[in-house]
């Protein structure tokens, strides 16, 4: 069976960084991990309308630093920074340490797998045809500069009695190439017929930093065979 490994997990430490970067002793590790989970859950609930792609958590010197990657930084910051100050106080209370909130803007949301998946999910909830939503997402990504994109939707598509999966791909998406920069994410669309799952793979190019260029060896020409009888 053609089962696929998680594209982000297999590339951790190769082309993908971790989204939690801290070190802790055995006694503190479980508490920090639980604190990370609570902070992520709180921010995901609070910032549903802010097009948040990912949340990176660092813990320098008995404090917590949270970087929110979003396509709509104005929604996160609020008027004169009021909203971000509320978030900072809430994160500090959840983590039990001083907190710092940083905002990182995503300039090209069409090339972010999480934002593309969420966009398709919202369209399906508004009863847009799933094929049209998939095709629009693929065309936008390729127009902005993706080298390849694949979108898969699964569930009771179009209200069908039997659930099925359909996918659409353009360009190339090399899942086996570890140096390939592939952004992968999932989302769920809650429709009146049930839940529809969305998966998105976006291939942005190859990461070649620190790699030696491969020089092709010249092929040796085989001697020509003499015809028989001469």
Swiss-Prot record:
<keyword id="KW-0699">rRNA-binding</keyword>
<comment type="subunit">
    <text>Part of the 30S ribosomal subunit. Forms a tight complex with proteins S10 and S14.</text>
</comment>
<protein>
    <recommendedName>
        <fullName>Small ribosomal subunit protein uS3</fullName>
    </recommendedName>
</protein>
<dbReference type="InterPro" id="IPR001351">
    <property type="entry name" value="Ribosomal_uS3_C"/>
</dbReference>
<dbReference type="InterPro" id="IPR004044">
    <property type="entry name" value="KH_dom_type_2"/>
</dbReference>
<dbReference type="GO" id="GO:0019843">
    <property type="term" value="F:rRNA binding"/>
</dbReference>
<comment type="similarity">
    <text>Belongs to the universal ribosomal protein uS3 family.</text>
</comment>
<dbReference type="Pfam" id="PF00189">
    <property type="entry name" value="Ribosomal_S3_C"/>
</dbReference>
<feature type="domain" description="KH type-2">
    <location>
        <begin position="39"/>
        <end position="107"/>
    </location>
</feature>
<dbReference type="Pfam" id="PF07650">
    <property type="entry name" value="KH_2"/>
</dbReference>
<dbReference type="InterPro" id="IPR009019">
    <property type="entry name" value="KH_sf_prok-type"/>
</dbReference>
<dbReference type="InterPro" id="IPR036419">
    <property type="entry name" value="Ribosomal_S3_C_sf"/>
</dbReference>
<keyword id="KW-0694">RNA-binding</keyword>
<keyword id="KW-0689">Ribosomal protein</keyword>
<dbReference type="InterPro" id="IPR018280">
    <property type="entry name" value="Ribosomal_uS3_CS"/>
</dbReference>
<comment type="function">
    <text>Binds the lower part of the 30S subunit head. Binds mRNA in the 70S ribosome, positioning it for translation.</text>
</comment>
<keyword id="KW-0687">Ribonucleoprotein</keyword>
<dbReference type="GO" id="GO:0006412">
    <property type="term" value="P:translation"/>
</dbReference>
<dbReference type="GO" id="GO:0003735">
    <property type="term" value="F:structural constituent of ribosome"/>
</dbReference>
<dbReference type="GO" id="GO:0022627">
    <property type="term" value="C:cytosolic small ribosomal subunit"/>
</dbReference>
<dbReference type="InterPro" id="IPR005704">
    <property type="entry name" value="Ribosomal_uS3_bac-typ"/>
</dbReference>
<dbReference type="InterPro" id="IPR015946">
    <property type="entry name" value="KH_dom-like_a/b"/>
</dbReference>
<dbReference type="InterPro" id="IPR004087">
    <property type="entry name" value="KH_dom"/>
</dbReference>
<dbReference type="GO" id="GO:0003729">
    <property type="term" value="F:mRNA binding"/>
</dbReference>
């Amino acid at each position: 069976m053609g089962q696929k490994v998680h594209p982000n997990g297999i590339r951790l430490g190769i082309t993908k960084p971790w989204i939690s970067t801290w070190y802790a002793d055995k006694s503190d590790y479980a508490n920090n991990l639980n604190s990370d989970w609570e902070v992520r859950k709180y921010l995901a609930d609070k910032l549903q309308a802010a097009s948040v792609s990912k949340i990176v958590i660092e813990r320098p010197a008995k404090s917590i630093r949270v970087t929110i990657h979003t396509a709509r930084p104005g929604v996160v910051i609020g008027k004169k920074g009021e909203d971000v100050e509320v978030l900072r106080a809430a994160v500090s209370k959840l983590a039990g340490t001083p907190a710092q909130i940083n905002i990182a803007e995503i300039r090209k949301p069409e090339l972010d797998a999480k934002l593309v998946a969420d966009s398709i999910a919202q369209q399906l909830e508004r009863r847009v045809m799933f094929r049209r939503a998939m095709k629009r997402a693929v065309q936008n990504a390729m127009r902005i500069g993706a080298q390849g994109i694949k979108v898969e939707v699964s569930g009771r598509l179009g209200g069908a009695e039997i659930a099925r999966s359909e996918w659409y791909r353009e360009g190339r998406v090399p899942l086996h190439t570890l140096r390939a920069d592939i952004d992968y994410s999932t989302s769920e669309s809650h429709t009146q017929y049930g839940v529809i799952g969305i998966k998105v793979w976006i291939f942005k190019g190859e990461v070649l930093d620190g790699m030696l260029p491969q020089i092709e060896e010249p092929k040796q020409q085989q001697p020509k065979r003499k015809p028989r009888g001469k």
